[in-house]
Regions:
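Long, low-complexity, Ser/Thr/Pro-rich intrinsically disordered stretches
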Residues: 13-16, 46
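Residue-level detector of alpha-helical secondary structure
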Residues: 5, 17-20, 103, 107
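Alpha-helical protein-protein interaction modules
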Residues: 9, 27-140
Length: 140
């Protein structure tokens, strides 16, 4: 399984697929297969592969499917939320036109890791909000 994830990280999808196929009996295989499916743009399949365990990865697949309510529930249930969790909540807020949710969650992400400020400045997810005073003040 680890070799498959390393191949996926290198962009070697063929090797990752081959190695994932031989690792389906491994308990963590669903996560690895879900990552592979996300790289292939198969987000609905990835959601199924990730299963019911709340994770940032599951939320990303749900966001890419337009399942914002599901992604919100998933992110709220992540066992150990981190800056990425807060950033993803901000993405969901942006996609649902919730400026206050965007600002609140982006503030939390930046408080945990200041690099999220620069990332948010460049992220097209926030383009519609990039000129609002609240957003500008937060990411400066």
């Amino acid at each position: 399984m680890n070799e498959a994830l390393l191949a996926l990280d290198r962009g070697d999808l063929a090797t990752a697929q081959r190695l994932m196929g031989s690792a389906v009996e491994v308990p963590e295989a669903g996560q690895g297969i879900g990552f592979l499916q996300m790289h292939e743009g198969k987000y609905a399949d990835a959601v199924r592969s990730f299963g019911n365990t709340p994770s940032n990865a599951l939320a990303i697949a749900q966001i890419m499917q337009g399942q914002y309510a599901d992604a919100t529930r998933t992110l709220a249930a992540v066992a150990q939320p981190n800056g990425e969790t807060a950033y993803l909540k901000a993405v969901v807020a942006a996609r649902t036109n919730d400026l206050q949710g965007l600002i609140s969650n982006l503030r939390s992400a930046i408080a945990q890791d200041s690099s999220y400020a620069l990332r948010a400045q460049r992220d097209l997810e926030f383009a519609a909000f990039s000129q609002t005073p609240e957003f500008v003040a937060l990411v400066k």
